[in-house]
Amino acid sequence: MLHYLQGLLSALDLTSLLDAVLRVAAIFLCLTVHETCHGLAALALGDPTAKSMHRLSLNPLRHIDWIGLLMMFVAGFGWAKPVPVDPRYFRKPKQGMALTALAGPVSNFVLAVLAMLISKVIYLDRKSVV
């Protein structure tokens, strides 16, 4: 048994383990920020629904749909719990829904740009970033 465990541990590459942990953390961060931004946009436009349901939180457990998360790892796509929005609170419901829907993807774009800038700083002394 001990020999088996030693073989298993030697086969583990700590770099790939760290890579997997960072990927999972990035997924949790992106899903959480994405859904929170939907709620913040709705709140800014007059809809308190997400706030009253405690969904304006950076706590990933409030936003993660466990089946959607599993699908993300198994199939390469997934989802989170959608933030509830009531368009009746918006002065212009169609425009409010469009802006609220746009807030999530915009947050993903901003996070991607930040990640790119951080990686440029980290790998500044290298010739290329992969």
How would you name each of these model-derived features?
Residues 1-130:
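Hydrophobic transmembrane alpha-helices and their immediate loop junctions
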